[in-house]
Amino acid sequence: MFLLGSGGKHFEDELRNAGAKILEVEIKRFPDGEKYVRVMGNGDEATVVSSTFYPQDEKIVELLLLGDALREKGFEKLKLVVPYFAYSRQDRVTKDGEPISVRAVMRALGIYYEELYIFDTHNPETLRFFPGKAVNVSPARVIGEYFREKLGDGLVLAPDKGALERARAVAEVLGLEYSHFEKRRISPTEVEMHPVDVDVKGKNVLIVDDIISTGGTMVRAAELLRKLGAKKIYVSATHGVFAEGAIERVSRAVDELAVTNTIPTPVSRISIVPELLKLE
């Protein structure tokens, strides 16, 4: 059965409509600001679901409290699904004295949970920091199906070579061609982009990445595709970690911006619930 933390409540209606069993939990705040959780119901196994978007630290502490409460109730096997995993980009030391933040969080969660599932984690290598079983879940199928009719016989592009595997996964769902943008610095302040080995003229194009934050790269890529004669331009990502004004900037530059609902946003039109149901 599922237990939904405060970062997973937006999945509840769809999960219930699919017939999933959901364990009741009370989550509130003490007058001094500390978090209170109480698990209602009993069982042997539970799958806790909660994204750790803002306020990230609060949601991480909540997951620890939920894990402790479930153990106290006698649950023997606990899975944790964190669709968006905070601190995933803090995966290395760049200055002396810094922590590897993603490692610290994973080790703490590993005290209570045997299995961890993350959707499209920024760096899959960090999964080794979790003491138990850790899995990177691909949203390629749900993203691909959402854009199937819109793209037709178009193509899928990654904004850079590092995201090429993501574009390949979505393209394989659709049976389409895929490639990536190559960046070349032509001055200290200017970077040139171009798609590698594909002709976009007259085609519908989907640009896909793991995270959109400021949206600057997506806007520049879309502007270039317009100049190259692309027909319709779509942008998607697993996680919409949008900085202020980013949704508006990207939306103005493309025909549609649609991300998954690992984080609830106004453009979270692609549901990961079909993938969540496989993890119960």
Swiss-Prot record:
Catalytic temperature dependence: Optimum temperature is 50 degrees Celsius. Half-life of the enzyme activity is 55 minutes at 70 degrees Celsius.
Uppermost EC category: transferase
E.C. numbers: 2.7.6.1
Cofactor annotation: Mg(2+)
Pathway where this protein functions: Metabolic intermediate biosynthesis; 5-phospho-alpha-D-ribose 1-diphosphate biosynthesis; 5-phospho-alpha-D-ribose 1-diphosphate from D-ribose 5-phosphate (route I): step 1/1
Effect of pH on activity: Optimum pH is 7.
Annotated Mg(2+) 1 binding sites: H122
Binding site for D-ribose 5-phosphate: R185, D209, S213, T214, G215, G216, T217
Keyword Cytoplasm tagged: yes
UniProt note on regulation of activity: Activated by Co(2+) and Ni(2+) ions, however Mg(2+) ion shows almost no significant effect on the activity. Equally inhibited by ADP, CTP and GTP, while dTTP and UTP are less inhibitory.
A molecular function GO annotation: ATP binding
GO cellular component: cytoplasm; ribose phosphate diphosphokinase complex
Active site residues of this protein: K183
Single Gene Ontology BP annotation: 5-phosphoribose 1-diphosphate biosynthetic process
Residues that bind Mg(2+) 2: D160
Record field: catalytic activity: D-ribose 5-phosphate + ATP = 5-phospho-alpha-D-ribose 1-diphosphate + AMP + H(+)
Note describing how the cofactor binds: Binds 2 Mg(2+) ions per subunit.
Keyword annotations of the record: ATP-binding, Cytoplasm, Kinase, Magnesium, Metal-binding, Nucleotide biosynthesis, Nucleotide-binding, Transferase
UniProt xrefs under Pfam families: Pribosyl_synth (PF14572), Pribosyltran_N (PF13793)
Chain sites annotated for binding ATP: D32, G33, E34, R89, Q90
Cellular location(s): Cytoplasm
Family of this protein: Belongs to the ribose-phosphate pyrophosphokinase family. Class III (archaeal) subfamily.
Role this protein plays: Involved in the biosynthesis of the central metabolite phospho-alpha-D-ribosyl-1-pyrophosphate (PRPP) via the transfer of pyrophosphoryl group from ATP to 1-hydroxyl of ribose-5-phosphate (Rib-5-P). It can also use CTP and GTP as substrates in addition to ATP.
Descriptive protein name: Ribose-phosphate pyrophosphokinase
Organism of origin: Thermococcus kodakarensis (strain ATCC BAA-918 / JCM 12380 / KOD1)
